[in-house]
């Protein structure tokens, strides 16, 4: 087995699906950055760094897929919460359709 090839392939798949994963996590609940990282890890076992998440969230904001707001905490340290927009929900539906079609196609050829 070519472990190096598989490792690189897994990395590419993770990078290519991270926006899809983040939008799915935000579908029914708003989260601040650290919570979002933890939710992604909990549901996918993918560990991402803050240095990966925040540029992604900025791109999603520029595309009007998510919004953010600062919320003051009792500790005095504000947290930036991310929420899916209506455009984000529509986009996520399109992405899910593509993903499920792709998944079904892969299952067919993998038998």
Give the residues covered by each predicted segment.
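Glycine-centered, phosphate/nucleic-acid-interacting loop/turn motifs that mediate DNA/RNA or nucleotide
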Residues: 64
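Amphipathic alpha-helical dimerization/coiled-coil segments
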Residues: 90-111
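Intrinsically disordered, low-complexity serine/threonine- and proline-rich regulatory segments
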Residues: 1-17, 95-97, 105
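Basic, amphipathic "hinge/linker" alpha-helix immediately C-terminal to the N-terminal HTH DNA-binding motif
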Residues: 74-96
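Short, solvent-exposed loop/turn elements at beta->coil junctions and helix N-caps
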Residues: 9, 71-72
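Short beta-strand "wing" residues that participate in macromolecule-binding interfaces
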Residues: 68
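N-terminal helix-turn-helix DNA-binding core of bacterial DNA-binding proteins
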Residues: 10-52
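Short, hydrophobic-biased segments on the C-terminal half of alpha helices
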Residues: 57-61
């Amino acid at each position: 087995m070519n472990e190096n090839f598989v490792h690189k392939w897994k990395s590419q798949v993770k990078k290519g699906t991270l926006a899809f994963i983040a939008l799915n996590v935000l579908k029914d609940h708003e989260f601040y950055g650290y919570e979002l990282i933890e939710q992604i890890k909990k549901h996918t076992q993918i560990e991402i760094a803050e240095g990966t998440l925040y540029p992604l969230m900025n791109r999603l904001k520029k595309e009007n897929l998510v919004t953010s707001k600062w919320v003051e905490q009792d500790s005095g340290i504000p947290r930036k919460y991310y929420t899916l927009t209506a455009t984000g929900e529509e986009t996520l539906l399109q992405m899910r359709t593509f993903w499920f079609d792709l998944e079904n196609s892969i299952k067919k050829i993998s038998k």
